[in-house]
Amino acid sequence: GIYVEKDYQMAYEYYLLACQKQNREGFYHLGRWFFYGIGQKEDKHKAMQYYQQASHYHYSKASFMLGYMYHYGDGISKDLEKAKEYYQLALQEGYLEARKELDKLEVEK
């Protein structure tokens, strides 16, 4: 933390509270934690579930990460069509980095 000692358990509990209130940032950050193994054991399946919830609430970074997971088969089966859908959604939601990944997909086809 900033100005305080890091307490992953307390942060995790706050993110869970945020999720209970359908807070898209809470869903995204827990997805990130499970994707990268921050404060929790890495679990791509759980990461995907949290990213899906955040994406449902139009959180562009979560939509991008779902596209990434499908694009590269990171923790799930590779599916270029689903990757494209999520990258397009992220781009529509304002996440400009998705354009680069969409361009890569076009080259791969």
Q: Where in this protein do the model-derived segments appear?
A:
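Hydrophobic face of amphipathic alpha-helices that form TPR/SEL1-like repeat modules
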Residues: 4, 27-36, 40, 63-72, ...
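Short helix-capping/linker turns of helical repeat alpha-solenoids
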Residues: 1-2, 20-24, 36-38, 43, ...
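TPR/TPR-like (Sel1-like) alpha-helical repeat modules
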Residues: 79-96
